[in-house]
């Protein structure tokens, strides 16, 4: 065999080995740092919470440390921090009164501060009766709705993630985390708590651009409540959409 043929054979063998190694290299790294954004447009009674109509927005970071790696399965410990998180509650700002009978009266009773409510108030007029000076007046009362936003900081140190097909660019995964959230005032209603516990679980897909860079799209069930430590504890159940960009090492 000529020298040229030997060189060509060696080059082909080297390329084949390189491709085989690339195929076998997992898209999984021992440590992963990530940044993410989250949004939930509404809350409702999904499992435990009863505070409806809440919106949640969050920006945060996470750290993953791999615990095991197999051919078709990988697991990692996860911790997340949310230095910026906003919880928007529906409120009642006042009551609009209408009494058409003579002497007619209409006016607005405004509260000194908006009152957060368990459920968004309806704008449908309610029939009411006013008795004064031996006269009875029939009219309507309409609640005036509003919102308030509270900035929250949250930390979830206890989490775990299981990924399928760690050798593939597209990896389905499931996650579960537990932690707490701290706010400057009670959420979601008065007399609840400024310190709440959180837990969440969800599923998504991780898409690798390279062996160390990836994007994640995920949907989670998120619960926030004070576990009965205060007079009020309606709790918030939210369906959260999450987008993450990750750097592996």
Feature names for model-found ranges:
Residues 18-67, 238-248:
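Short glycine/proline- and aromatic-enriched beta-strand/turn motifs that initiate or cap beta-hairpins
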Residues 20-31, 66-77, 165-172, 209-215, ...:
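Short loop/turn motifs that connect adjacent beta-strands in outer-membrane beta-barrel proteins
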Residues 24-29, 204-249:
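Predominantly the C-terminal beta-signal and adjacent terminal strand-loop region
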Residues 37-43, 57, 81-89, 178-186, ...:
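Transmembrane beta-strands of outer-membrane beta-barrel pores
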Residues 45-51, 142-147, 185-191, 226-233:
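Extracellular loop and loop/strand-boundary signature of outer-membrane beta-barrel proteins
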